[in-house]
């Protein structure tokens, strides 16, 4: 490579592509009887980048999985919730099929189908959304509805959700517009009462109003990377009609609202149908019968419900399902800890009785699958603290008494290397 110098013969060197001399450019790279300047290198890089961007959408077009394939992938990571998986698979497939065909099919405009997930804490709402985004290889971001407020009040603006999505894909607007946004705790922004109040409800109904346009589809103006809003700044224009919004919440108490509606038909007096306690539907069965009117009574405004036409309900996980979650998914919790111990050269074994005890403890805490990690972490804490300083440990065994806190994990030692080689 030459840097503004003549070659051995004293001749002035020129770029073979743009014809500029070595004095007009910063660097001149020499090959066998050919030269290229730094400006031409940059230009070539830009051309290649543009071509890659043009090719990428065509790859995405051919890679859209079918609802059956989406469901199968969800089965690898999420235990149970079969109906919710089916609803999600169809909704996600239709959403991305709509994007591929430019929002229309034979002149018919295709509507946007955002999704509402209703289910108790730890039932897999967030995991389902994350797994979908990973399968489709699209940007994914999560937002907490409880931190959102109307514009102009202390708290996060709803536009901040789109900024987070842009950050996940290095401010590539085209990528962001194919992304998935999961808004958690959506039930916490329900209207505080049925009667309009004199004071503004800036974190309840106010946030629902602010989210309406964003979820339905608008062009959101977002400041570019790392910039605060000021008049001289050019804003990025993001079309949210192409972004899939999934809202999730536990909706504690919604089952009672549904029960009141369902049981109203039983009547009173001599002709009333008397229901025994055993006839009462479970919470999961009631949630599966949810109607828009129930969500309105719960505190969501009709316009907001209208923007979430696809509703999927998740059941509370049983003890058997929690045991499956511990050992069956590809990234099951026991597999994660076994991989962690393998990095120390140690095998980790969970006996079946230990898995039963972990599941029972999580059921008692009513935290669903979310509480499993804290239980396992507490049981293994001392071992993970001591293990890096110990030698010749080959295996760690966890049984029921360890989970109950009655004993320490069983450590199985191998023979010291020196002794083994001597024999």
Swiss-Prot record:
Organism: Salmonella typhimurium (strain LT2 / SGSC1412 / ATCC 700720)
Entries under InterPro entries matching the protein: AAA+_ATPase, ATP-dep_Clp_protease_ClpX, ATPase_AAA_core, Clp_ATPase_C, Clp_protease_ATP-bd_su_ClpX, ClpX_bact, P-loop_NTPase, Znf_CppX_C4
PANTHER family referenced in this protein's UniProt entry, alphabetically: ATP-DEPENDENT CLP PROTEASE ATP-BINDING SUBUNIT CLPX-LIKE, MITOCHONDRIAL, ATP-DEPENDENT CLP PROTEASE ATP-BINDING SUBUNIT CLPX-LIKE, MITOCHONDRIAL-RELATED
PROSITE patterns named in the record: CLPX_ZB
Subunit structure: Component of the ClpX-ClpP complex. Forms a hexameric ring that, in the presence of ATP, binds to fourteen ClpP subunits assembled into a disk-like structure with a central cavity, resembling the structure of eukaryotic proteasomes.
HAMAP family in the cross-refs: ClpX
GO CC annotation: HslUV protease complex
The name this protein goes by in its record: ATP-dependent Clp protease ATP-binding subunit ClpX
Protein family (similarity comment): Belongs to the ClpX chaperone family.
Free-text function comment from the UniProt entry: ATP-dependent specificity component of the Clp protease. It directs the protease to specific substrates. Can perform chaperone functions in the absence of ClpP.
Keywords recorded for this protein, A-Z: ATP-binding, Chaperone, Metal-binding, Nucleotide-binding, Zinc
Binding site residues for Zn(2+): 15, 18, 37, 40
Species classification: Bacteria, Pseudomonadati, Pseudomonadota, Gammaproteobacteria, Enterobacterales
Positions with a binding annotation for ATP: 120-127
GO biological process, one term: cell division
UniProt superkingdom: Bacteria
Xref: NCBIfam families: clpX, PRK05342.1
A GO term for molecular function: protein dimerization activity
ClpX-type ZB domain: residues covered: 2-56
The encoding gene: clpX
């Amino acid at each position: 490579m030459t840097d503004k110098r003549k070659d051995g013969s004293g001749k002035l060197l020129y770029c073979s592509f743009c014809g500029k001399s070595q004095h007009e450019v910063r660097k001149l790279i020499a090959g066998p009887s050919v030269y290229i300047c730094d400006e031409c290198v940059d230009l070539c890089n830009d051309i290649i980048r543009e071509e890659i961007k043009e090719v990428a959408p065509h790859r995405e077009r051919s890679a859209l999985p079918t609802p059956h394939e989406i469901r199968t992938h969800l089965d690898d990571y999420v235990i149970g919730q079969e109906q919710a998986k089916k609803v999600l698979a169809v909704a996600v497939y239709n959403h991305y099929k709509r994007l591929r065909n430019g929002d229309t099919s034979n002149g018919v405009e295709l509507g946007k189908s955002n999704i509402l997930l209703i289910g108790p804490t730890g039932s897999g709402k967030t995991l389902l959304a994350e797994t979908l985004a990973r399968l489709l290889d699209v940007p994914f971001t999560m937002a907490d509805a409880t931190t959102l407020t109307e514009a102009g009040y202390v708290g996060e603006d709803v536009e901040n959700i789109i900024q987070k999505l842009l950050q996940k894909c290095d401010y590539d607007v085209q990528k962001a517009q194919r992304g998935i946004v999961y808004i958690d705790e959506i039930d916490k922004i329900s209207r505080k009462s049925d009667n309009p109040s004199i004071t503004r409800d800036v974190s309840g109904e106010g946030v629902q109003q602010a989210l309406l346009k964003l979820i339905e589809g608008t062009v959101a103006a977002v400041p570019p990377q790392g910039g605060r809003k000021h008049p001289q700044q050019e804003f990025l224009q993001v079309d949210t009609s192409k972004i899939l919004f999934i809202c999730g919440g536990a909706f504690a108490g919604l089952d009672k609202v549904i029960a009141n509606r369902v049981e109203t038909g039983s009547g009173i007096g001599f002709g009333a149908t008397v229901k025994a306690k055993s006839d009462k539907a479970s919470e999961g069965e009631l949630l599966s019968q949810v109607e828009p009117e129930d969500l309105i009574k719960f505190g969501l405004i009709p316009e907001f419900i209208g923007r979430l036409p696809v509703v999927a309900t998740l059941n509370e996980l049983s003890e058997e399902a929690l045991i499956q979650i511990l050992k069956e998914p590809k990234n099951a919790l026991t597999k994660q800890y076994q991989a962690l111990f393998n990095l120390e050269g140690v095998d980790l074994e969970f006996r079946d009785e230990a898995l039963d005890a972990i599941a029972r403890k999580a059921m008692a805490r009513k935290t669903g699958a979310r509480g499993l990690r804290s239980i396992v972490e507490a049981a293994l804490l001392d071992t993970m603290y001591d293990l890096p300083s110990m030698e010749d440990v080959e295996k760690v065994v966890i049984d029921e008494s360890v989970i109950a806190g009655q004993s320490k994990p069983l450590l199985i030692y191998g023979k010291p290397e020196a002794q083994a080689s001597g024999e």
